[in-house]
């Protein structure tokens, strides 16, 4: 499943295609959304927001389209009039004079009013988004030490969208490698230096992955491009200590780590 940086880049592409342009045609596959087709025609997409792995498409009339791709949903941008060659099932089409965005295969799609947006169950449940520029390391540290999260092993906590939205498996293993911690560690057991380092890295690595388009390159981690240090690198030498990277399963997901320097 795509993680926060990939979802945000997808939203950027959708925004670049249709933001601020009048919608010339709107189509929904689901019957409960059909009444909104006429309401949205002629309106503008004002912005596309991400909340972890959910997308919120905001319209100029105050409505918001909520969509969660889950495992199979995917958005596409095409030239208006183009007919894509795909076996996927179309769910949403938002068309402007020159560009059209299409949502395929997703099933978790709703139209929300401004009031419903504040009470939506998923949006109420997710934590702050790691790509939200207003989120600070100090706030992350406070969440780590909160009664709700301080006794949770990082192997599960860093996959829990209620803790921080937008994290996922590759971010989990890269974050823990960067600070030299294991999946069994808990926030309550860390010293002040470890807590401060983790609070910063929980934001730094997702943001680095997003801003550098997640490209793999020979540059160093804090250089121009993001590069995996342990993810999918089992059997290779750890660049920090020379130990051999191993693969196991934690919280039902593949977990990559260096036993020599992550202790």
Swiss-Prot record:
Gene Ontology terms for molecular function: class I DNA-(apurinic or apyrimidinic site) endonuclease activity; damaged DNA binding; oxidized pyrimidine nucleobase lesion DNA N-glycosylase activity; zinc ion binding
Cofactor binding description: Binds 1 zinc ion per subunit.
Keyword Lipoprotein: no
Cofactor dependency: Zn(2+)
Record's catalysed reaction(s): 2'-deoxyribonucleotide-(2'-deoxyribose 5'-phosphate)-2'-deoxyribonucleotide-DNA = a 3'-end 2'-deoxyribonucleotide-(2,3-dehydro-2,3-deoxyribose 5'-phosphate)-DNA + a 5'-end 5'-phospho-2'-deoxyribonucleoside-DNA + H(+)
The keyword Membrane is assigned to this record: no
Biological process per Gene Ontology, one example term: base-excision repair
CDD domains associated with the record: EcNei-like_N
Entry keywords, A to Z: DNA damage, DNA repair, DNA-binding, Glycosidase, Hydrolase, Lyase, Metal-binding, Multifunctional enzyme, Zinc, Zinc-finger
EC number assigned by the record: 3.2.2.-, 4.2.99.18
Active-site annotation: 2-3, 53, 253
Function: Involved in base excision repair of DNA damaged by oxidation or by mutagenic agents. Acts as a DNA glycosylase that recognizes and removes damaged bases. Has a preference for oxidized pyrimidines, such as thymine glycol, 5,6-dihydrouracil and 5,6-dihydrothymine. Has AP (apurinic/apyrimidinic) lyase activity and introduces nicks in the DNA strand. Cleaves the DNA backbone by beta-delta elimination to generate a single-strand break at the site of the removed base with both 3'- and 5'-phosphates.
Family membership noted in the UniProt record: Belongs to the FPG family.
Stated name of the protein: Endonuclease 8
Gene designation per UniProt: nei
């Amino acid at each position: 499943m795509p993680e926060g940086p990939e979802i945000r880049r997808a939203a950027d592409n959708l925004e670049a295609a249709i933001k601020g342009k009048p919608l010339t045609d709107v189509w929904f596959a689901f019957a409960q959304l059909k009444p909104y087709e006429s309401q949205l025609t002629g309106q503008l997409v004002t912005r596309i927001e991400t909340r972890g792995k959910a997308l919120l498409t905001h319209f100029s009339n105050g409505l918001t389209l909520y969509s969660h791709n889950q495992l199979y949903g995917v958005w596409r941008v095409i030239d208006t009039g183009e007919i894509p060659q795909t076996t996927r099932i179309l769910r949403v089409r938002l068309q402007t004079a020159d560009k059209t965005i299409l949502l395929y295969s997703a099933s978790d799609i709703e139209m929300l009013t401004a009031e419903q947006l504040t009470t939506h169950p998923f949006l109420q449940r997710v934590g702050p988004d790691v790509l939200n520029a207003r989120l600070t390391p100090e706030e992350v540290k406070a969440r780590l030490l909160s009664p709700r999260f301080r006794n949770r092993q990082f192997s599960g906590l860093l996959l829990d969208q209620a803790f921080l939205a937008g994290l996922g498996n590759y971010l989990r293993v890269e974050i823990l490698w960067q600070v030299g911690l294991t999946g069994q560690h808990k926030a309550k057991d860390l010293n002040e230096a470890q807590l401060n380092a983790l609070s910063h890295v929980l934001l730094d690595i997702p943001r680095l992955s997003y801003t550098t388009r997640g490209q793999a390159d020979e540059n160093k981690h804090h250089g121009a491009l993001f590069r995996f240090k342990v993810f999918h690198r089992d059997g290779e030498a750890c660049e920090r200590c020379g130990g051999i990277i191993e693969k196991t399963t934690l919280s039902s997901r593949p977990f990559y780590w260096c036993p020599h320097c992550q202790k």
